[in-house]
């Protein structure tokens, strides 16, 4: 199978996977709608076409949120990321449909059927995504790629690429020291399935990129910060020379308004849903050592503004009584047994829903850093302050796509990718 046909077949498989998930979830919604909601409308019950239109609207919601959260990238993203995206899609679509049902009823609709439907959607999306992931792995073998690196060895990147053996195999690697002519020869010999351009100087990287473009060879780049900053630049055609406009002004008023509205809605719903879990966590912390339940600490949010972030206490009392700020390590002796559980399950983060409700934080955004730790990062990476163009978040790209040992520089890149991708449909 040549590479162009392979991509066409992969695209077809993605379309089939998305269609299967949407049709299954629409079928589930149709059953729940007919059984629990359709007969309780304050108007006369819909005719068949009316019920069909409601199901179609639900399907459109699924497609929109699937696009926003990346749920269509089956066979491309990690299986866990796809399942997370599908779960977010089902949650948002079902929440929106529940609000729509409220408008159609005389009183507040039953929420338990909607919760049950959401759980069924989670299971269906997870199973279908897993099945298609396995099918992708069987039908499309991994690409054998050529890694070109600069003055710094790329063992870390090579290791990460090899952690996805279903997608990539670094079959050959070469340093830029061999010269541009030899690099082009190596691309012709070993890079027909793909070339990875590591941390190269811009001039050489651009020439190699043009060479691969002319040869129709797929290229993977480790982006520079400037690459990320112009991702959403606006093309201007005001005369015969093309211009790109990078506004660099943060969120617009309508983006801030919509993001704040969504934060209020999500934080309110989650505070209600998770209140029993938070009560149990608070009792466990108090009973263990009789110390304070909550822990607050200064963090930074938009514009460098300081605020107190709230968490359930997971460490011993006075864990930093010497006044020295230290990041928690993997097997930190200061973490209590209760703390290990609530950290592993992220329950310790739930009080930050109050920060979101107050407006200090957002649901999605760069994680808030302590002022002293942020200062340390900025000494070696001055651009680290760019993360403060938006509110700090409960979760963000660095948490979703990163790992415990992801470098501060890579976390910065991930956070900037989120900031530069913000729009009215991606907030």
Task: Indicate where each model-derived feature is located.
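Juxtamembrane loop-helix boundary motifs flanking transmembrane segments in multi-pass membrane proteins
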Residues: 4, 8, 71-75, 79, ...
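Short, glycine-rich, amphipathic interfacial segments at transmembrane boundaries or analogous
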Residues: 226-227, 233, 294-334, 395-411
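C-terminal terminal-structure detector
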Residues: 358, 372, 383-425
């Amino acid at each position: 199978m040549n590479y162009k046909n392979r991509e066409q077949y992969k695209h077809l498989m993605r379309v089939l996977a998305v269609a299967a998930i949407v049709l299954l979830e629409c079928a589930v919604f149709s059953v729940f709608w007919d059984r629990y909601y359709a007969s309780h409308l304050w108007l006369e019950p819909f005719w068949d076409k009316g019920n069909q239109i409601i199901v179609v609207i639900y399907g459109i919601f699924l497609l929109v949120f699937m696009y926003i959260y990346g749920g269509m990238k089956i066979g491309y993203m990690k299986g866990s990321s796809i399942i997370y995206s599908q779960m977010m899609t089902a949650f948002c679509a079902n929440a929106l449909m529940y609000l729509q049902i409220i408008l159609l009823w005389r009183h507040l609709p039953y929420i338990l059927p909607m919760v049950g439907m959401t759980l069924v959607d989670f299971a269906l999306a997870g199973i279908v995504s897993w099945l298609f992931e396995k099918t992708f792995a069987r039908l499309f073998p991994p690409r054998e790629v050529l890694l070109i690196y600069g003055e710094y060895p790329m063992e870390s990147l090579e290791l990460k690429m090899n952690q996805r053996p279903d997608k990539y195999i670094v079959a050959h690697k070469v340093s830029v020291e061999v010269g541009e002519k030899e690099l082009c020869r190596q691309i012709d010999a070993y890079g027909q399935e793909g070339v990875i351009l590591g941390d190269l100087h811009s001039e050489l990287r651009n020439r190699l990129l043009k060479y691969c473009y002319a040869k129709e060879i797929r290229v993977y780049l480790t982006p520079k910060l400037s690459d990320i900053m112009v991702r959403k630049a606006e093309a201007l055609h005001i005369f015969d020379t093309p211009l790109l406009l990078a506004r660099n002004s943060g969120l617009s008023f309508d983006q801030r308004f919509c993001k704040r509205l969504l934060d209020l809605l999500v934080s309110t719903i989650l505070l209600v849903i998770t209140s029993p879990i938070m009560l149990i966590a608070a009792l466990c912390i108090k009973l263990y050592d009789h110390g304070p339940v909550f822990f607050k600490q200064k963090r930074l949010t938009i514009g460098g503004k300081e605020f107190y972030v709230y968490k359930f206490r997971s460490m011993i009392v006075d864990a930093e009584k010497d006044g020295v700020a230290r990041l928690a390590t993997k097997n930190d002796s200061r973490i209590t047994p209760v703390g290990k559980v609530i950290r592993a399950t992220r329950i310790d983060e739930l009080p930050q829903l109050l920060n979101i409700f107050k407006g200090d934080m957002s649901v999605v955004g760069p994680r808030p850093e302590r002022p002293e730790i942020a200062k340390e990062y900025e000494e070696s990476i001055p651009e680290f302050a760019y993360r403060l163009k938006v509110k700090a978040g409960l979760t963000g790209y660095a948490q979703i796509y990163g790992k415990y040992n992801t470098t501060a520089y890579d976390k910065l890149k991930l956070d900037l990718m989120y900031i530069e991708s913000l729009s009215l449909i991606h907030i």
